[in-house]
Regions:
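Catalytic alpha-helical scaffold of carbohydrate-active enzymes acting on polysaccharides/glycoconjugates
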Residues: 1-131
Length: 131
């Protein structure tokens, strides 16, 4: 799909290319590099990607790497919901549920897409992790 526009009506090529290259090519190169070095790692996981590309999740789990929830989708930036806290909470909870479903346990951490949490993100994560 074509990158969606960000403020200023500019296509968000940064997030689009991170997602597309990373999920199609980059992850397999990274797995090979870490396999050759014998080093385990952590890997971020967008929920949508986990549902659409389960082979990636399986490859990471087989290596014993830690998967870190990373929003619903790479282009679903939490700051879009700065004025819609109910929607942000919904995105976080939906993401964490997919994580539990595909990884088989609750998440241990979080990394917001584009490293952009809102002022509410930590409270919503605390709420989700400590119900």
């Amino acid at each position: 799909t074509i990158p969606f526009p960000v403020p200023g009506n500019v296509p968000d090529y940064v997030n689009w290319t991170w997602r597309e290259y990373g999920q199609r090519v980059g992850i397999w190169r990274i797995l090979d590099c870490f396999d050759k070095a014998g080093i385990p790692a952590s890997c971020t996981m967008n929920a949508k990607m986990a549902l659409e590309r389960p082979r990636i999740i399986q490859a990471v789990k087989e290596r014993g790497w830690e998967l870190v929830p990373h929003n619903w989708a790479q282009n679903d930036i939490l700051t879009f919901y700065a004025d819609a806290p109910k929607k942000e909470r919904e995105v976080i909870n939906k993401t964490l549920q997919v994580y539990r479903d595909v990884v088989g346990r609750p998440a241990k951490g979080w990394l917001s897409s584009s490293l952009r949490p809102t002022a509410n993100t930590l409270d919503f994560l605390k709420e989700a992790y400590f119900k």
